[in-house]
């Protein structure tokens, strides 16, 4: 994917959703620096483009009905954020067979010997997102997020 800002969006959204899922149903403060890394405002008090892009991604997740929050803490965090029912259900459900097959082709797993209940848990969108984040591959993160929230998958090539 040539658009770095889109890759960063997918990664920011993935990290935020994993943090919220891990705390669900508790409300948490979702800090931009915990997602995008440290940022020092410039001499005018303005944050970097990267910081603001991450903050924008968090606001977009709310606008699209994937999270709720009580207020913003300046442009640094969302106060009392929690997943919506829509996001919780989506993250908890198994991914499509097509998406799982594409990911398994990249990194074959030995899941056939596992009990069905464990295989189902390992096939959920949240598990695939966590694995994609652990891989560090922007292409894999993008593919998993597209499959989980945008209903499509793209052919995965190599990461840059």
Language model features: what each stretch is:
Residues 20-24, 61, 90-94:
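Generic structural signal for hydrophobic core residues of well-folded globular domains
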Residues 4, 46-49, 71-79, 98:
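Short acidic, glycine/proline-enriched loop segments that cap or flank alpha-helices
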Residues 79-113:
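Short, amphipathic alpha-helical interaction segments positioned at domain boundaries
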Residues 107-160:
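Membrane-inserting effector segments that mediate pore formation, membrane fusion
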Residues 2-46, 52:
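Short amphipathic alpha-helical interface segments
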Residues 59-75:
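A short, conserved structural fragment
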